[in-house]
Amino acid sequence: VKRQSFILLFLVIVFLPGCKENGSGIGIGTVVVFPEISEPIQITDNDKEHLFASYYGINSFSKNQRYVTVLETELKDGIPTENNPATLGLVDLNTHDFIPLTKTRSWNFQQGCMAHWLATNPDSLIIYNDLRDGKFISVILNVHTRKEIKTIPYPVSGVSPNGKEAVSINFSRLRRTRDSYGYGGGGQDAKLETTFPEDDGMFLLDLETGEAKLLVSIADVKKLVPELPESGLEYFNHTLFSRDGSKIFWLARARPERNTTSLTVNRDGSNLQKCFPDGWGGSHYDWLNGDELMITAEYKGKQYGHILFTVGEKNYKRLGNGLLDFDGHGTFSPNGKWMVTDTYPKNDLREQKIYLMDMKTEAVLPLGRFPQPEEYAKKWRCDIHCRWSPKGDIIGFNSTHIGNRQCYIFKLGTLNDS
């Protein structure tokens, strides 16, 4: 697990000749200064299983970086159902104490309960999903008073940077099409009788009024995705607002083949478009800013990579000079200078690796190797799922390398130009 011989690895990577694809690359003799990075620091106890309470790339940190949102569960193996409530709490990064806040019955091992800190009060208010009275909802909670400020009659799948809007998808349909995602309990009508429903899809939520409007229906994407048999089901997952809140990215997928189409739309519902040509698909993603988007996909339908491009243009660029040609969970630092990504378990050692890339030169620094035990190889797997703190000086991630699921952080030193 410890980062061994990092200085040597750093120099080897930095002084390799660049491939110069699309004008990028690292020239011979280029010097890249990475921040000093701590050893992995475990922030949760081993008595129970823990994971960050949202999907990768979503901020889990309060604005002052004192607290992070974490789920605690006794479930180790198996798909969580409505009968497996998890405890949503905070970890105090000063003491590493776990502070329980509430229970939730809408969660999974991949995306947690989709807890977000709200920019309207980023040190006090979070929103998270739950199942109540047979319905999936979201709850706005003051973490210090434990007072519920508001309940929204829709679950959230992404929250706008301004903290005033969110998007919602059908988590019941998601559970029936990909059971390691979505929630148990039947809190929404999965509409299993319809391949492309016209009244379901991605909704835009007003978190102040609780009102929702259908932004893009599943039927709206029928002509943009591969043809399905009558028994097939198209579904939406993985939504993310751009950094300025003007656009939304998401994936349209299908059963039985799980073909994937990467899509974007403006926040007002205009300019619905595909991100890639046919055959590229899409898997993981993050916005660099309001217009540039990174998606891991099959470049030219041949090679998986971390592909950066401007929405609406075809200026596709594989990041990492060949070192990041895999499907990772890439996410950008708040200042856009760094991208951290990870790998799935590989070879007999089942090692998951974390890499940090300098966006200017595309130099890549390994941060660690984390072996995943065989018992986590199934649908309840533990992906690394990195996430940045608001100041960009902490990276949080999940790992099972000690034999159970726990939360960790790296602390990054500051650079003069950071």
PLM features: what roles do these ranges have?
Residues I41-L51, T102-F109, P155, G210-G232, ...:
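Surface-exposed loop and turn segments in beta-propeller and other repeat-based domains
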